[in-house]
């Protein structure tokens, strides 16, 4: 009998829950699916709560909650049974969660509002509980590749144990603790900022800078409106603060990537720039419009130094062939420069680096990884499979790195040929879930 393969997922967020839910449903239908084991540092859906460092939990979800773990309910995994698969997945939908917890009527009567991040995390935990998701708690310290009788397998090392898998999916935005000047009380990381917000600490400063032009920085600005600050300067490389397109045609790009691969790389990058990367939602832009404290500075932070009770930022700006540098002083700097989709690279052991560089045919970088992501959201020409949905936007469509098509994401990954090691090597049982 062929052993069941194991898919290890680093991070127990929305993507991990979506893949685990569909795998569980496939097994219920009598269809082979891999064991899904998530390795998580703190808790399921932690990044949607204050403890995760990316939010205070009270801000609203930027996408419709109906884009849940099964959306868009258009599976193509099981010929002649895809409709049944979609119907079974609706048991784990956002509406099913609300019905199951007695909140559906109130949600409808309130106009179907976007939930808070905390409420969204509760939904994801509800799904994880209902599918009995296998979660091992521990911080990943290294990712390596081991050889066995059945070929190579991934090994994910935590302080307590090593989890082996025939495939590996890496999720999550990285660590929110980084900042341009670590340790300085006048420079806040993403985590430090949201910790203050969660504790209801008011920020009082004359000149505040927010570094970053993406949705992470936008949510910080949305929070800063209620604090006692005189001016807020947004620093981003773009010529202005662009608004994310949120009409039907833009949304379709996220939920239906058909035709995406027919675009040139330049066309895809242009679409991502207009709809996903470095853009603010229309809701945040409307708030910015009514607040005259907001300013914008174009540039990238090249250097930061504390001097005379202020933080001096050196901004680098390209103007034609010339690179200009200007210095600006602030009383407080909040580094919201955003997630690093390649945060995991420093965790790769030498054997894993060699494997990836061999498959890529050259040095490993964020750019080379992005351009090598195949239809199954894995790095092409690399075995065992390494799934990187966070880097798949350029080649496969803008919905895969975020929450916009979790049902399609799980289809792509569970439809891949993961292979299998031996049953004895399967991932260890999960600790009791919190």
What are the residue ranges of the model-derived segments?
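Flavin (primarily FAD) cofactor-binding/catalytic cores of flavoenzymes
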Residues: 1-43, 48, 104-227, 231-434
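Conserved N-terminal glycine-rich FAD pyrophosphate-binding loop of Rossmann-like flavoproteins
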Residues: 42-83, 241-259
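Generic intrinsically disordered, low-complexity segments enriched for polar/acidic and small residues
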Residues: 56, 68-70, 89, 94, ...
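Short linear sequence motifs
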Residues: 64-66, 85-90, 113-119, 273
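A conserved beta-strand/loop capping segment in the N-terminal third of enzymes
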Residues: 73-107
């Amino acid at each position: 009998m062929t052993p069941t393969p194991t898919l290890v997922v680093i991070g127990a967020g929305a993507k991990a829950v979506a893949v685990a839910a569909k795998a569980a449903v496939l097994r219920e239908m009598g269809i082979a699916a891999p064991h899904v084991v998530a390795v998580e540092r703190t808790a399921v859906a932690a990044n949607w709560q204050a403890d995760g460092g990316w939010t205070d939990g009270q801000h609203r979800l930027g996408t419709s909650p109906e884009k849940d773990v099964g959306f868009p309910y258009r599976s193509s995994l099981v010929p002649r049974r895809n409709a049944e698969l979609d119907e079974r997945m609706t048991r784990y939908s956002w509406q099913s969660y609300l019905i199951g917890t007695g909140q559906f009527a109130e949600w409808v009567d309130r106009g179907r509002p976007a939930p808070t991040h905390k409420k969204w995390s509760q939904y994801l935990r509800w799904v994880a509980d209902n599918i009995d998701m296998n979660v091992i708690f521990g911080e990943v310290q290294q990712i390596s590749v081991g050889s066995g009788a059945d070929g190579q397998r991934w090994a994910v090392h935590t302080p307590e144990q090593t989890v082996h898998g025939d495939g590996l999916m890496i999720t999550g935005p990285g660590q929110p603790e980084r900042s341009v000047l670590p340790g300085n009380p006048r420079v806040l990381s993403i985590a430090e900022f949201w910790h203050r917000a969660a504790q209801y600490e008011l920020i009082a400063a004359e000149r505040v800078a927010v570094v970053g032009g993406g949705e992470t920085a936008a949510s910080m600005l949305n929070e800063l409106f209620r604090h006692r600050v005189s001016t807020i300067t947004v620093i981003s490389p773009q010529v202005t603060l662009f608004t994310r397109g949120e009409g039907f045609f833009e949304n379709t790009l996220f939920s239906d990537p058909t035709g995406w691969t027919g675009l040139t790389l330049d066309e895809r990058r242009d679409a991502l720039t207009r709809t996903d990367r470095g853009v603010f939602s229309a809701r945040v832009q409307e708030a910015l419009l009514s607040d005259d404290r907001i300013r914008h500075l174009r540039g990238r932070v090249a250097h930061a130094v504390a001097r005379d009770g202020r933080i001096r930022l050196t901004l680098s700006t390209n103007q034609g062939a010339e690179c200009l540098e200007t210095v600006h002083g602030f009383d407080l700097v909040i580094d919201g420069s955003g997630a690093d989709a390649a945060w995991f690279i420093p965790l790769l052991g030498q054997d894993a680096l060699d494997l990836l560089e061999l498959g890529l045919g050259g040095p490993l970088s964020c750019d080379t990884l992005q351009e090598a992501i195949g239809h199954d959201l894995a790095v092409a020409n690399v075995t065992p499979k390494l799934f990187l949905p966070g880097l798949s936007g350029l080649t496969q469509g803008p919905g895969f790195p975020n929450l916009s098509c979790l049902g399609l994401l799980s289809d792509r990954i569970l439809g891949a040929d993961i292979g299998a090691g031996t049953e004895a090597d399967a991932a260890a049982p999960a600790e009791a879930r919190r």
